[in-house]
């Protein structure tokens, strides 16, 4: 019996990042990229329609950023897990992201294998971390 396939929505305002992540994740047999959004607003619309298991969310985007989009997403779809993928590695941003409801926080210069491990960990966790 094969394990369930993780359905992922990629959210980033940079097309090359979205497409690169989709291509990279598409090579994994246990991951299906169900959609790509370029803003927090579009992420909320697509998540409501596509019901992803995990949203891979950029932190800083024009319009609604990743923090606010995460807050709204976990309110409207608490079964969906959010992992921040960002170029910002500071502790304050990470705490803010976790307080908004994100389950994981990974910087964009993370090794590909570590990104996959973090994504799988976020998908399999049943609890939300607390950040104080």
Q: Language-model segments: which ranges?
A:
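Active-site beta3 strand of CheY-like receiver
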Residues: 50-56
